[in-house]
Design a protein with these regions (language model features):
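Cytosolic, membrane-proximal regulatory domains of ion/volume homeostasis and mechanosensation machinery
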Residues: 1-3, 77
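C-terminal structural segments of small proteins and small subunits
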Residues: 10-11, 48-79
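Exposed beta-strand/loop interface patches that mediate assembly or binding
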Residues: 13-17, 21
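Short alpha-helix capping/helix-loop boundary micro-motifs
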Residues: 23-29, 50
């Protein structure tokens, strides 16, 4: 399942990232923020209108905002 399918207060482990579907700059930023295979992420909040964009994710001690289109490139297993 990809990260965009998880609801609030869900914790998952990243098992794969489709780096090819992301622009080079986007991929670099996500890696710098700790988004990579093996990382544990929690969905803290989702937008409330229409596309429910963006997602607020907790990775370690950081909370980041991620667009749904980018979250679709991140495959996770529920913890």
């Amino acid at each position: 399942m990809t990260l965009d399918g998880f609801e609030n207060d869900t914790t998952a482990r990243i098992v794969a990232v489709d780096w090819a579907s992301l622009a080079e700059g986007e991929a670099k930023r996500l890696r710098a923020l700790g988004v990579d295979e093996g990382a544990e992420v929690s969905v803290v909040h989702r937008g409330v209108f229409g596309t429910r964009d963006p997602l607020a994710l907790r990775i370690g001690r950081m909370t980041i905002a991620l667009r749904r289109v980018h979250a679709r490139a991140i495959a996770c297993h529920l913890l």
